[in-house]
């Protein structure tokens, strides 16, 4: 079957290709087509007729030439034969075109009336088409033509309903040999009514119609086709005749079987003309169908031509000399009737106006004959067409061009309508879940900011806040431990809460007896083991009193351990403020009060050392009341208990008050939940590795639990209590030493047992990355302002120091203490601080930076000591913080430039001058003030003007050399490198001494 591309057909019809694609489903083409796809010739014929173009006669019947008759065609012919009238004499009639069947729902189309029978005309010889001609359209709403009896020929291709046509008179050459025409279908409309329009459902093919056959007089030399059986016809009286068709060019067709003629038709076969294939064999008709189709029908009333409707193009008329054959469909804005002076089918002349629209420009698609008017908007098309359609896109682009340009104003973020809680290291997926949006929307917001992330990638807290703001949500940033604790607390049951032991922190000034008081309670001797008799570590202990446990935390009282005291106040339930009765309130006592008030915990004052003779407890109460702590016996709410750590006086009363205050607070915990606590202290043990002292505040800590502690992830390998006994479980308010950390945590970090190890490792990596970035930011390139500042501070000396301590808290305290010693003359710079013994890497670092190494309660390793001796590195070891700070101060003083001071000795007056050979000028002088030492320096004053400064060459009394001449004595003085001495000059003796620089004035 011949095919044609949609692009070529669109250019031929002068329409857009997408309009043809939208029309294909209505013609029964359900396949997916594109602009470059091909369609069958029969579909192309329907499209040509739909758009009002003449169908060339050289387009042959594809079903009759290239393909055998299909089963569907056979059924259609059987259906047509079932509606044919009874057999009648065949007669040659004028050629006609197929008619569009009336809708099945139209009642007028179903009424059938018998038509008068006419004698059949003899069959004319069949000729091939010789010339193209316009299709001749039947009246609107006409019924299908009846079919004669006999064998069926190849079916004609289905065509859509053509446009109406003006009837013409029959040609005078009708008597010449011509092609037999099909019988005229009987009119099937009620009288004085407009014929109903044929309505086709979208996506269904138009009803088939027969192909028109031209009946024109053959020209000389024209080759005619073979004989063809005529069809019985019952023309309606007064029906308009069809015009003659233009001869078509010859075309090779496949031989067809000849239909047997009906009654009255000539039975003798016609002789085939030259070039015509042999006729098909004749098949006798079925008697039952002949009898059925030969039944008489009711006559049909003559039909008047329908008046043209607005918006519907009228049927194409015959060509007129001097006018174009194709006049095209009526376009938008074109009048239905041509104006005077305007040629039909041509655009009107517009002098000075714009050019007419291009023929292929987008126009309105006109419906076919009998079809309802199309909707206002182009809603046609196959189901599943992509939207928006091309027309909508073009219309939108035109509107953008035509309407005035407006300044683009970016819409601000939506108003805040909710608040979410985000933790550090939140991922894109977790943020989308909290915002209740899809993750791809969050990723799109990040891509708009130029940030490309994966769905499981962590986000910075500031960036997550900005993204949440774009979705109309405010954020509250909390740590991972706090968020995990909140989720656990929300899920826990109040019935699981049990009473826990109180945590008591002992605070006070140094040497006020804090550790001694705790030793008396624990019946131990911890203070005796402390270096210098002072506490330099924070410790936690558990004491049992009357079947109940009390946890004590001992904090240092030295001024350098402020952060330790602050850390102890944050994890405590009760603060015991120890004040010596013989010393009174001291600066660290006031600091401890401030820490306790900041932590909002109750305070119990223990007035210690009441066994001494000079103890004044009442004076202590007065001083504390001036600071806002009013005793109970004075009408206040602060419990004050006089105690003595040495004689254990008042200790039972102190413990009783601790339990009473704890009962008032109603301290409870849930032992069945995952454990959480606080790191009190951390140290690096040589045999056990990193060890952390943890106070469990809630839950139960067991061996084998995974935990996160700041930027450290680990697993509990072993636990030891305060007495060094290994345990398997630690209940709430229990201090334990935990082994199994990957690295050393910071003192004060939160300790949290986790179940999601992957999430915990992700948080640890995030924190570690942040710490590295912070360290890198400190060592980044300096700015120009910083360079100028360093140039201005070029006179400031710097003392680099490396600190190694036994525990992390001590290293932290030492770093802060030494940095506070810096002033405008000498600056102490701590290059590195760590925990553990002094190793070889510390020595090499000190050698490279010309620093000194300070070890606090640690010793250097063997290879480190050898390296330090080889590299000449100064290593200082200390156990008491007092001695350490004093030595650093001396080192700072030694860095400054020496200061020399002039010390006056005495002066002598020149009374006479002598000149001796081999010696030079000698001045005879008398000492008038002080003394003149021989090794001192001197200056010569003449009229109170210094004329020379130098050293004394020789000092003699008479003929003897002397070391010193005192006041009132005479002597002879010679000066080195100076001989211009005169009578009356003053020789002043002085000495230069080096004076130590005062660093701390």
Swiss-Prot record:
Protein's UniProt name: Translation initiation factor IF-2
Region named G3: 554-557
Positions that bind GTP: 508-515, 554-558, 608-611
Start and end residues of each stretch annotated as Disordered: 56-418
Biased composition (Pro residues): 136-170, 180-194, 204-217, 229-252, 305-322, 345-357
Organism of this sequence: Solibacter usitatus (strain Ellin6076)
Function of the molecule: One of the essential components for the initiation of protein synthesis. Protects formylmethionyl-tRNA from spontaneous hydrolysis and promotes its binding to the 30S ribosomal subunits. Also involved in the hydrolysis of GTP during the formation of the 70S ribosomal complex.
Database matches in Gene3D superfamilies: 1.10.10.2480, P-loop containing nucleotide triphosphate hydrolases, Translation factors, Translation initiation factor IF- 2, domain 3
Subcellular location: Cytoplasm
SUPFAM superfamilies xrefs: Initiation factor IF2/eIF5b, domain 3, P-loop containing nucleoside triphosphate hydrolases, Translation proteins
